[in-house]
Amino acid sequence: MMSKRRLFRWPAPRTVCLGCLALVFTTLVTMFLYMSEPLDIQPDPEPVNNQIFRQLSEITNTYTNASASEVGLVLAATQKEDLGWLLNYCRDHGTIPFIYTTDTPPAPYLLVPATTRGREATAYLSYIVDFYDQLPKYTIFIHSNVDQWHNDLFGPRTSSVLPHLRLEAVDAQGYVNLRCEHNPGCPTSVNPWEPTQIDIEKDDIRAFFPQVYETLFNVGPEKVPQHIGNVCCGQFAVSRERILQRPRRDYERMLKWAAETELTDSFGVGWVFEKVWHVVFGMEDIYCPRYEQCRCDAYGWCGPLPSGETLQAVRAPRSKGKST
């Protein structure tokens, strides 16, 4: 006999509904249990630059005015800049970094200036105001990049220049530019009372230089010089004694002008200070030491010169020369 064919039957609707509900319930319970478990999520690694900033700030935080370190390095930096060279230098030479952020919002770990207008100019002034009562014996103001075209001796790397700097020259002179080459800046870089017609028509800061000079130095127009000249640019060493020759309120006044002036923009603020740093720190309005003598005083490179002359480096009375 032929067997009967077995017919397929669909499950009853009620059975299907119960099965779906069971599946949904099981899924929800599983998700709840999974989400209740603590997730082993590793935090994102700290950016390399932030790691360097943190390590530099740890060195800064060790500083007191009784610190064994005599030398502070002051600079402005953005979060994108690689300061690995500075970290290595400070560790190798026992110097203290004072790094001011120019970012908005401020970069982590760095010191915050009173204003970011003028970039390194206001970082330098903020440092003096912040640490006026506990300055290291020597302060060297530098730019943040590892290579600087301003460095005219020992190559472009600031880390190659600093070890050769004679701190005895800073003792003797109070202010020492890290650069010796006269061009640009010497013999004259600004003629305050003789702006060009183009400067006047464009409302360039040069057209207002007498007014700016009077404000920065709290003097009358009769004290504004006819000419200003100095070795470029914004890298120099200053002794504690020379910084303290001005009261703190002088530096605060300069900072206030930088933050509030409507005569120029941030770039112009920085430009102004590059023209007058030597005046801020007690040098003549035109300060252009002979190139060979500057090289001898600042770095001990005294000859003999091609002419056969051998120079004598400046010395501070009763002081022992050191290098950074």
PLM ranges: what are they?
Residues M2-T324:
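ER/Golgi luminal nucleotide-sugar-dependent glycosyltransferases, focusing on the catalytic module
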